[in-house]
């Protein structure tokens, strides 16, 4: 998943409407009104250098390694493979991405090493994303104790949507068509909307243990926060794609030669940067932190503890 430019806010102090005399002026017979304070505009910018934040992503490495070790122990003790194996894939890839942050658009990297390149990162991310969304969909089916057909259908829609999103993100990388990233993220919006609807219905209509009902509450809470955020993300991706393509610019025809060239480009081209705009600004920083190093790993591990060991 991807994000774009930083946000900059301004706070203006309030003031009255009366005019004031300049400090240096010609004498006047009528006199001057009392001077009013000059107007001040305070700028509160987003940090332009993300270097400290990118280093802080390393804190996600021991977190994911710990979760991986605990999950592997649960699996060795006979835990549910449909819950635990997807989690193990996710934890290992998330630790990797905390070590070697990458942004596909522009092949932006923090560490100038082949391990940060877009192609290997995307291959690993494909397995990770499909795995953990499959786990989330399996959770819905496990908690659908009344076997409601349309709830199961929504859970499988999540798997289909993440598969379609993989198609679009790979197409964006291999054809350099930035607009395709929008459709990738639209797939994520659809699958989490399905997860939120299914979780809400099950929570309202199904009698579950507190721990299992808590999983539905987590899904609902995430959906209420993520879906509005994703709307902003989609808008920013759309605007960014338009800003990088002029109206008269025709995309290069999609040929095997184009795909091969962009694959080689994604494997070998790296652009080291710590500029906030290159990493997607506030949206990009929020996404990386929550996805690899905090919220999603914690959520997936909680699923493992509740359903993977019973």
Please tell me what each predicted stretch does.
Residues 41-63:
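Hydrophobic transmembrane alpha-helical segments in integral membrane proteins
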Residues 76-89, 146-159, 209-218:
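Membrane-interfacial loop-to-transmembrane alpha-helix junctions, especially the N-terminal start
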Residues 94-120:
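Helix-loop junctions on the outward
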Residues 64-73, 98-105, 122-155, 163-174, ...:
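Internal transmembrane alpha-helix with an interfacial aromatic "cap," most often the third helix
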Residues 58-67, 198-310:
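C-terminal transmembrane-bundle signature of multipass membrane proteins
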Residues 47, 114-127:
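Short aromatic-rich membrane-water interface segments that cap or initiate transmembrane helices
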Residues 90-96, 159-171, 223-229:
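Aromatic-anchored segments of alpha-helical transmembrane domains
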